[in-house]
Curated annotation (Swiss-Prot):
<dbReference type="InterPro" id="IPR001048">
    <property type="entry name" value="Asp/Glu/Uridylate_kinase"/>
</dbReference>
<comment type="function">
    <text>Catalyzes the reversible phosphorylation of UMP to UDP.</text>
</comment>
<dbReference type="Pfam" id="PF00696">
    <property type="entry name" value="AA_kinase"/>
</dbReference>
<comment type="subunit">
    <text>Homohexamer.</text>
</comment>
<feature type="binding site">
    <location>
        <position position="62"/>
    </location>
    <ligand>
        <name>ATP</name>
    </ligand>
</feature>
<feature type="binding site">
    <location>
        <position position="165"/>
    </location>
    <ligand>
        <name>ATP</name>
    </ligand>
</feature>
<feature type="binding site">
    <location>
        <position position="77"/>
    </location>
    <ligand>
        <name>UMP</name>
    </ligand>
</feature>
<dbReference type="GO" id="GO:0033862">
    <property type="term" value="F:UMP kinase activity"/>
</dbReference>
<dbReference type="InterPro" id="IPR036393">
    <property type="entry name" value="AceGlu_kinase-like_sf"/>
</dbReference>
<feature type="region of interest" description="Involved in allosteric activation by GTP">
    <location>
        <begin position="23"/>
        <end position="28"/>
    </location>
</feature>
<dbReference type="GO" id="GO:0044210">
    <property type="term" value="P:'de novo' CTP biosynthetic process"/>
</dbReference>
<feature type="binding site">
    <location>
        <position position="174"/>
    </location>
    <ligand>
        <name>ATP</name>
    </ligand>
</feature>
<dbReference type="InterPro" id="IPR015963">
    <property type="entry name" value="Uridylate_kinase_bac"/>
</dbReference>
<feature type="binding site">
    <location>
        <begin position="15"/>
        <end position="18"/>
    </location>
    <ligand>
        <name>ATP</name>
    </ligand>
</feature>
<dbReference type="GO" id="GO:0006225">
    <property type="term" value="P:UDP biosynthetic process"/>
</dbReference>
<feature type="binding site">
    <location>
        <begin position="138"/>
        <end position="145"/>
    </location>
    <ligand>
        <name>UMP</name>
    </ligand>
</feature>
<dbReference type="InterPro" id="IPR011817">
    <property type="entry name" value="Uridylate_kinase"/>
</dbReference>
Amino acid sequence: MATNAKPVYKRILLKLSGEALQGAEGFGIDASILDRMAQEIKELVELGIQVGVVIGGGNLFRGAGLAKAGMNRVVGDHMGMLATVMNGLAMRDALHRAYVNARLMSAFPLNGVCDNYSWAEAISLLRNNRVVIFSAGTGNPFFTTDSAACLRGIEIEAEVVLKATKVDGVYSADPMKDPTATLYDQLSYQEVLEKELKVMDLAAFTLARDHKLPIRVFNMNKPGALRRVVMGEKEGTLITE
């Protein structure tokens, strides 16, 4: 790669799943993975990219799962939102230890723990090269953190949502179950809907489509993949118009 190569994005929204943080543990937060992700985000900041982050909470709690067991769905989702705040606190701490300025915002007030979400404040922080972590989802039950990622991405005028997963991109079928599944380089929003490909839930996906927000799905477990994505190299699957 030429040394004078420049990033293809100025501002991104990085969506991390809670499961990505748990590593091989199966639950909770793997400190080594957290630190590696913080280092990869630091690389982006050093390239001059403005970074917003949304983290899921599935490594700690899943509201939908307990709803099936009889818990009120609203209560379960509130607990799931708090799980994303816990992950956000861990990520902010990891970024601070990596000497990266980061701010944690919550969709609902948690005074003394983190800041309330403010669109204007978030934009100002991003312009000053601060990483902004958006937690507590959208602040409403029944909406996933993928919906939160697309919503915040649109609000902060990110050029792309980078969805970090455990696989190399979007496949024609589940690569864990079907060895013949093929990896797509690029898809249109329409193709994703027609082929019924699982990229993110429909509410999140249609929000991105309606606002022409591109989505790139890539494997966060592959070292250097995030950097390759922002440098415009062949990595993952791009979904656009």
